[in-house]
Amino acid sequence: MQVIARGIRGWIGLLGLLLALGLTSTSAWAARSGEFVTPHTRYWIDPQGQATIDEVLRLPPDALQAMERPRSFEIDRGALWLRYEVPALDAARRWSLVLEGGAFTNRATLYAPGVGGAWQVQDAGDHLPVAQWTHPARMPVFTLDGAAGTAVWLRLENHPAPLSPSLRLQDAQDLQMSRDRSQLWLGVYLGFGLLVLFLGWVHVRLYGDRVFIAYVAYVTCMLGFQIAFTGLGGLFFWPTLPRWNDAAPALFMLWLTAAGIWFVREVSALSRHSRLLYRFATAWSLFGFLFP
């Protein structure tokens, strides 16, 4: 019987050790840099977009729903509130919450508990000049300083496009590496585009052909769209122009489409095949340039 008892105690001890290791590894995994933490949030939609952080805190617990998986929200002129509990973080590293794909989110505000009960507020979004963001970047970045279990609140606005929030937890080193990597590849892409633009302009000067003029316009609009869409424009080229930063991706897309129709019209010599199609392509191209 003593042998059996010792065996049972041994198994219990082993199970306890495995449980402790499992909890430790789970905690470490929860704080791993680079992890997408959107499924760990809970959300509430404010239909009017007027609720303050204090009013949100007074909501009943069942008003918040678990995110569980990536979702898209049609909130019109309302606001989406996300509640995220800070996991156990390595205090030796600085941590940030990154709103990926948020280069053209209208407004993103993070509320974190501060000293004396006051809220520490961090602002971003293309309705605010990038130069006035708490942490100017291509996309909204928020610092996390709270202890494990601290609840932070992220308020998001976006009209008229839907919201598809994607939150990533990153330490300072990973954040800087991802910035450097993305800017390197964007620089390579834009550098190649500028080379193509230069060669197109050389052909315009050499031949004076309208095909090359249309091609130069198309490449220019394409580069402008990429600069605006990726957030490089707001960060480097127009950091104090929020209205332009908000409208630029849509405008450049319209102009890109119009320039593409113009280029196809010229390169295919459409006037030789159908005067009706030629006039239609001309009107459609002009509409794209003048509609904004």
For each feature predicted by the language model, list its residue ranges.
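Soluble non-transmembrane domains of integral membrane proteins
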Residues: W29-S182
